[in-house]
Design a protein with these regions (language model features):
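Conserved beta-strand termini and adjacent loop/short-helix elements that scaffold enzyme active sites
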Residues: 5-9, 138-141
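Conserved FAD-binding catalytic core of PHBH/FMO-like flavoproteins
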Residues: 19-23, 28-144
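A structural signal for the hydrophobic beta-strands that form the central parallel beta-sheet
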Residues: 4-6, 37, 164
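FAD/FMN-dependent oxidoreductases across multiple families
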Residues: 111-200, 204-205
Length: 270
């Protein structure tokens, strides 16, 4: 029971006491008791309904692309934390005997600009060195994109008839890949909230209903955002004592399976 409209552009939004309406560029009008905003970090819906946000610039940019590697990725993600930012290679399916990974390389903005200016051969060489040849040489790269990184958090996730979720409500540094997990958890919480409301015959888009979703997710998201900010600063530290204690602590956590598994389940939202 889903109608998928694509491509389509929304011309205007209008919220009323009983429903929210969208007017499309072709003149069609859509109405529903609730509008769910899942339109990304630069959410048009969030801006249209005047959700206030708190945000700041990390001073980092993420270089993203697809690269071909010399060695098989074994369907395993690889990440290296460097003082200038983390480098992650995420496994993709191979094509014949060629091996591919998705790259997310977060760097201080000036260094990211320098890397973006390199030609493909120079960039592959820099990436091979940065990744410590964990998958052999980087053989080739697709077109590169540089995305400025900002932390953003909506002070409220809901107003009457409208709910924000995922990146429209919060964005964090991609150093641990937690943005998508937070978004999935938002979806699960909102689905549960709306399911309970529907079974009880309650208004799906009322502020009373939607506040239950906000009360469940906002503290969880804030806690994860704070943890990731601390994580980022910990790995950016160049102090030898801090680096020694950090590495020793991580080594001990890796050896204590219940603690390690507990952390893994926590960040996966389980």
């Amino acid at each position: 029971n889903i109608t998928f409209l694509c491509p389509v552009t929304v011309a205007s939004y209008n919220g009323s006491e009983q429903q929210v309406s969208l007017v499309l560029e072709d003149g069609r009008e859509l109405s529903a008791p609730i509008l769910v905003a899942a339109d990304g970090g630069n959410s048009t819906i969030r801006q249209q309904f005047n959700f206030p946000t708190r945000e700041w610039d990390y001073g980092h940019s993420a270089i993203v692309t697809t690269v071909e590697t010399e060695q098989v990725n074994q369907q395993t993600a690889w990440q290296r934390f460097m003082p200038t930012g983390p480098l992650a290679l995420l496994p993709l399916d191979k094509a014949g005997d060629r091996h591919f990974c998705s790259l997310v390389w977060s760097q201080e903005s000036a260094e990211a600009e320098r890397l973006m200016a390199l030609d493909d051969a120079e960039f592959c060489q820099a990436l091979s060195h940065g990744s410590e040849h964990c998958l052999g040489k980087i053989v080739a790269t697709d077109k590169r994109y540089s995305i400025p990184l900002r932390q953003r958090h909506a002070t409220d996730y809901v107003v009457e008839r409208v709910a924000l979720l995922g990146d429209s409500a919060h964005t964090i540094h991609p150093l641990a890949g937690q943005g998508v997990n937070l978004g999935f958890a938002d979806v699960a919480a909102l689905v549960e909230t709306l399911s309970v409301a529907a079974k009880r015959g309650n208004d799906l888009g009322s502020l009373m209903t939607l506040n239950k979703y906000q009360r469940q997710r906002k503290p969880e998201n804030l806690a994860m955002m704070a943890a990731m900010e601390g994580f980022k600063r910990l790995f950016a530290a160049d102090n030898l004592v801090v680096r020694f204690l950090r590495n020793m602590g991580l080594s001990q956590v890796d050896k204590i399976k219940p603690v390690k598994n507990g952390i893994i389940k926590r960040v996966m939202g389980l």
